[in-house]
Swiss-Prot record:
InterPro entries for this protein: Asp/Glu/hydantoin_racemase, Asp/Glu_race, Glu_race
NCBIfam families xrefs: glut_race (TIGR00067)
Enzyme class: isomerase
Pfam families: Asp_Glu_race (PF01177)
Similarity comment: family membership: Belongs to the aspartate/glutamate racemases family.
Gene transcribed to yield this protein: murI
Residues engaged in binding substrate: 7-8, 39-40, 71-72
Catalysed reaction, written as an equation: L-glutamate = D-glutamate
The protein's name: Glutamate racemase
PANTHER family: GLUTAMATE RACEMASE
Length: 265
């Protein structure tokens, strides 16, 4: 099966890694819109325009399913992606919300995602009596993309972001941006051990597996097989090294422009 997914940068690697583990023997096309990183501080209209361009590009790739590996686009433009692609679309926010069991939930997300209250609304739809508090984290994505992950700086920033949530005595914490699982160790240093970390990619991966299983009866016996194609809109030189670091693959990466019709296939 041919599966597409995208993010503004390397955050979607956290989704791709879990999906590959649970759903091997498929082809994956990963698009990183690095030219417009980060998405989390963009306006609603900007994100909607990006969603139009991304869905148009993926239609050209003839994929069978699509994973929204960017929470900001998920929160603002999921309807656009679903309408334009006309194939099964799997999203992080809805997937995570449907699994929540705790009564007091914190969410770390980008400013644009928090502004929509997408996580709050999705969780309350499944569990109306849940207390949800969302915290915008504008500094995280730039720090992660600059590989500033294991420093005291990011722990200090995390401490500041988490304090309002800890004061509300949350039971679980949703990592509401696909970049954030990359700094889970730093977050865990600040969080009490009783607080459960929730990566939405886990629920999304499970839903994708159910879909693939329902459509595919014959799997290759080679469980290590995976076909990966990577595309970026800028920073072509550095992206293979990032893929090697986080995914343990050193792929060929193609440069594309989402504003032009002369796409690389």
């Amino acid at each position: 099966m041919r599966i597409g997914l995208f993010d503004s940068g390397i955050g979607g690697f956290t989704v791709l890694k879990k999906v590959i583990k649970l759903c091997p023997n498929n082809s994956f096309i990963y698009l990183a819109d690095t030219a417009r990183l980060p998405y989390g501080i963009k306006t609603t209209n900007e994100i909607k325009k990006i969603a139009e361009e991304i869905s148009s590009w993926f239609r050209y790739q003839k994929i069978d399913a699509f994973l929204v590996a960017c929470n900001t686009t998920n929160a603002i433009a999921l309807d656009i992606l679903k309408k334009n692609l006309d194939i099964p679309v799997f999203d992080l926010i809805g997937s995570a919300a449907s699994t929540i069991q705790e009564s007091r939930v914190g969410v770390l997300a980008t400013p644009s995602t928090v502004k929509t209250k997408a996580y709050t609304n999705a969780i309350l739809e499944f569990k109306p009596k849940t207390f949800v508090i969302e915290q915008p984290c504008p500094a995280f994505v730039p720090m992660i993309e600059m590989d500033n992950i294991n420093s005291d700086d990011i722990t200090d920033v995390a401490t500041g972001y988490l304090q309002p949530l800890l004061k509300q005595k949350i039971h679980s914490l949703i990592l509401g941006c696909s970049h954030y699982p990359l700094i889970a160790p730093s977050l865990r240093k600040v969080l009490p051990s009783s607080v459960k970390l929730i990566d939405p990619a886990e629920a999304l991966s499970f839903k994708l597996k159910l879909f693939i299983d329902s459509k595919t009866s014959n799997y290759s016996k080679n469980k290590n097989f995976v076909d990966l194609k990577f595309y970026v809109t800028s920073n072509l030189k550095h992206f293979p090294n990032k893929a090697k670091h986080w995914l343990n693959v050193f792929p060929e990466v193609n440069l594309v422009s989402l504003q032009k019709k002369g796409w690389v296939s």
